[in-house]
């Protein structure tokens, strides 16, 4: 028993963690959430927290991400529970919102694992990329949101007046002018 450790005691049996040792834990990451998964109770399994609803219909939403557009805001939800907060990066480039995460190779009970993903959203034309905010919940759900109406939908044209600068005097002409004027 000294060589075997149980990392978590939930549920209360030691065999729970090792009930099916040949099966890898859930490998989905960087994918969106369904609305029913946001408010469902969670299971504490291994080293991460997952919504219960994800276990039932896992194949139905593979590759999907939750995206909400309302009158007042743009909102996206992403499950990044396999990553620590310092491994997740959110940035905007022009009208693109890019979420990326990467963690180095780690040892788990099945061997070694490393993960990396990048998801890019196109922001609506009326969302100002400088006003995007990100919040990470305790169970690894990344909430990205920005108010809508921050930019004008119409293209504004600003015509800039071009002023003409006088040409610099020619050095030869300056010498001629100096000789003529006594």
Swiss-Prot record:
Pfam family, one: HSP20
Assembly information from the UniProt record: Interacts with DMPK; may enhance its kinase activity.
SUPFAM superfamilies reported for this sequence: HSP20-like chaperones
Family annotation (InterPro entries): A-crystallin/Hsp20_dom, Alpha-crystallin/sHSP_animal, Alpha-crystallin_N, HSP20-like_chaperone
Cytoplasm as UniProt keyword: yes
Protein name: Heat shock protein beta-2
The organism's taxonomic lineage, starting at the top: Eukaryota, Metazoa, Chordata, Craniata, Vertebrata
Residues annotated as domain sHSP: 55-163
Protein role: May regulate the kinase DMPK.
């Amino acid at each position: 028993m000294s060589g075997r450790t149980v990392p978590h005691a939930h549920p209360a049996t030691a065999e729970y963690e090792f009930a099916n040792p040949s099966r890898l834990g859930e490998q989905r990451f960087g994918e969106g959430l369904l609305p029913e998964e946001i408010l469902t109770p969670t299971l504490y399994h291994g080293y991460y927290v997952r919504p219960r609803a994800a276990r039932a219909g896992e194949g139905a939403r593979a590759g999907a991400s939750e995206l909400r557009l309302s009158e007042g805001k743009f909102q996206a939800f992403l499950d990044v529970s396999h990553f620590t907060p310092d491994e997740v990066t959110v940035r905007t480039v022009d009208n693109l919102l890019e979420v990326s995460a990467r963690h180095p190779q780690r040892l788990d009970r099945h061997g070694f694992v490393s993960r990396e993903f990048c998801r890019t959203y196109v922001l609506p034309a009326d969302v100002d990329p400088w006003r995007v905010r990100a919040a990470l919940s305790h169970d690894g759900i990344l909430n990205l949101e920005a108010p809508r109406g921050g930019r004008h939908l119409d293209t504004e044209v600003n015509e800039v007046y071009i002023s003409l600068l006088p040409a610099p005097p020619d050095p030869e002409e300056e010498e001629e002018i100096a000789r003529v004027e006594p």
